[in-house]
């Protein structure tokens, strides 16, 4: 998949930031020699910090580790090869030496550091929306583009439905039907009343999931409902590591009691699409695929172009005009300035 080309200034900034990071690593990193380490073993990254990561071994034990300088990137969910130290040094118990190939990853564009992976090896993205202040189908569509491009199954969750009167609920269900019609799964839930929380919990038991959505939609309430001991677990890990408590900006993978894993990633609150080109965004709309390539002109912009098969499908009721309009809003946003094109969900 082709990626948007960075400008010379962006490239220079990325190189400068990388150099500064390497310098910091040299100052803080422990030099692990071979005789200081045990045998290689498999593990999963459950938390990533600036120069450390917490790795869970096959027995469920968590160790804080350094990263080899040869590792280009490391995120929560990565499957790794690591070695435990014969003794703990400065609160660090071992070193990560290699990363297994990822099945998939979620990344967000960063103007200064390029495309930054957030999490890897995900089975399902839970797109959380809420009825208040307003339901934004445009934001849902942005997340769905990411899901389609990454090849990750989405679940659209509408939270706080307990705030809806029956008539309002019917209106919301009618709006969301455009997603059901093209094969997306939707769940109307309430963390407060417990409506459909059992169904959500059952779906989360199937693999590894990550929650995404705007601030205020109730992601934290959902996580606390599903995993009420989450804060206690964070505290326990900090005490065990001896390195003190990290801020809540760190992503973390949690094991759910009923099975499955949940990644809580505050970094997912900011989500831009400016690293994608128009062709990639078009491929992110699954219902467009059966008409693409059938337009009269190869360079069709799918607007007022004569013989546009996509526009004709909208006029015939085969494609939702709401989704079609949101698609063009996304395409138009690609040409916006830096301050405008960084899509913030905070």
UniProtKB/Swiss-Prot annotation:
Cofactor stoichiometry and binding remark: Binds 1 zinc ion per subunit.
Gene3D superfamilies associated with the record: Nucleic acid-binding proteins, P-loop containing nucleotide triphosphate hydrolases, Probable gtpase engc, domain 3
CP-type G domain segment(s): 103-271
GO terms classed as biological process: ribosomal small subunit biogenesis
Biased segments, Polar residues type: 7-20
Binding site for GTP: 159-162, 213-221
Residue pairs linked by disulfide bridges in the UniProt entry: none
Database matches in Pfam families: RsgA_GTPase
Any single Gene Ontology cellular-component annotation: cytoplasm
GO terms assigned for molecular function: GTP binding; GTPase activity; metal ion binding; rRNA binding
Protein's cellular compartments: Cytoplasm
Residues binding Zn(2+), per UniProt: 295, 300, 302, 308
Annotated keywords: Cytoplasm, GTP-binding, Hydrolase, Metal-binding, Nucleotide-binding, Ribosome biogenesis, RNA-binding, rRNA-binding, Zinc
Requisite cofactors: Zn(2+)
EC number: 3.6.1.-
Region (Disordered) residue spans: 1-25
Subunit structure and binding partners: Monomer. Associates with 30S ribosomal subunit, binds 16S rRNA.
Homology family: Belongs to the TRAFAC class YlqF/YawG GTPase family. RsgA subfamily.
Record's function text: One of several proteins that assist in the late maturation steps of the functional core of the 30S ribosomal subunit. Helps release RbfA from mature subunits. May play a role in the assembly of ribosomal proteins into the subunit. Circularly permuted GTPase that catalyzes slow GTP hydrolysis, GTPase activity is stimulated by the 30S ribosomal subunit.
Protein name: Small ribosomal subunit biogenesis GTPase RsgA
Species name: Haemophilus influenzae (strain ATCC 51907 / DSM 11121 / KW20 / Rd)
Gene symbol of the encoding locus: rsgA
